Regions:
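Subtilisin-like serine protease catalytic core
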Residues: 80, 117, 127-221, 235-238
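Structural motif
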Residues: 51, 70-73, 133-134, 199, ...
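Soluble non-cytosolic domains of exported or imported proteins
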Residues: 28-33, 62-69, 119-123, 138, ...
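Inhibitory N-terminal propeptides of secreted protease zymogens
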Residues: 1-102, 214
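Short acidic, glycine-rich surface-loop motifs adjacent to enzyme active sites
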Residues: 229-248
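Protease zymogen maturation seam
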Residues: 74-139, 150-156
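Solvent-exposed, polar/charged alpha-helical surfaces in well-ordered, non-transmembrane soluble domains
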Residues: 36, 40, 67-70, 127, ...
Length: 248
């Protein structure tokens, strides 16, 4: 690799390094990006690079010719090759997402500061944390999910501080036109509309990351998730909410 552990600022953000120092977590060889020469050698076999993972040292590619995978398996630095994805049917592919209309009907609960979230807040004792001054200020949270449908257009969510978004499933997709699950998860934490809905961390900053492909169930989603969690670490997030689970 062209990177060096003596220069971690070349592959980790200043915020990530500050968090590591604060938590006494050293930078080690697993933090080094996947060797660029290896990635390029794989690309030259006629495949498209989808994601890479430095912690488990993998490269995920896409191609429609199994002979290319056979050639890749013979490269001296490749330990093994595994099929992790299959093209979904046309029916599933055509499910793709259109922005539907938004009903911006704000429902106030004038007797409750937390609005619709009061039960969850009371159950988790988050109101006590808020009273003590812990409202998420200064913290960065990554939400790894299947999509954040219309979170950028819902008026009640406009004061959630989103610092960035990234799609690991398909970089050409609109992360705000995908599944609504992540939007709902985000609202439980980031909403900050008194008497409508106040979440558990209304003053935090948020990264929105998509790793779940709701149109198919394939092992590649574990690769997407690994790439997303590595990215979250590299930009220095403090916490990750990932309402997803996989098994081998």
């Amino acid at each position: 690799t062209t990177y060096s552990l003596s220069k971690p600022q070349e592959f980790l953000s200043a915020k990530a390094l500050a968090r590591r120092a604060r938590q006494q977590l050293s930078v080690d060889s697993t933090d080094l990006p996947v060797c660029a020469k290896y990635v390029e050698a794989i690309r030259k076999q006629g495949v498209r690079i989808v994601v890479t993972g430095k912690w488990d040292n993998f490269v995920t590619v896409s191609c429609n010719d199994s002979s290319r995978m056979a050639r890749i398996s013979r490269l001296p630095f490749v330990r093994s090759v595994e099929k992790v994805w299959q093209q979904p049917t046309r029916k599933n592919k055509d499910k793709a997402l259109k922005r539907d209309s938004i009903t911006d009907k704000v429902v106030r609960v004038d007797s409750l500061y937390y609005g619709k979230s009061y039960r969850q807040i009371q159950m988790s004792k988050a109101d006590k944390l808020h009273e003590a001054g812990f409202r998420g200020k200064g913290m960065t949270i990554a939400v790894i999910d299947a999509g954040f449908h219309n979170a950028d257009r819902i008026k009640a969510m406009q004061n959630i501080h989103i610092v960035g978004v990234k799609d690991f499933v398909n970089s050409s997709c609109d992360i705000y036109a995908e599944s609504s699950h992540g939007m709902k998860v985000l609202s439980c934490m980031g909403m900050n509309q008194p008497y409508v809905m106040v979440g558990t961390a209304p003053e935090a900053d948020y990264w929105l990351l998509r790793s779940e492909d709701e149109y198919s169930e394939n092992l590649v989603e574990q690769d997407y998730w690994a790439a997303a969690i590595e990215f979250a670490d590299s930009v220095g997030v403090d916490l990750v909410n990932t309402s997803l689970g996989y098994y081998a």
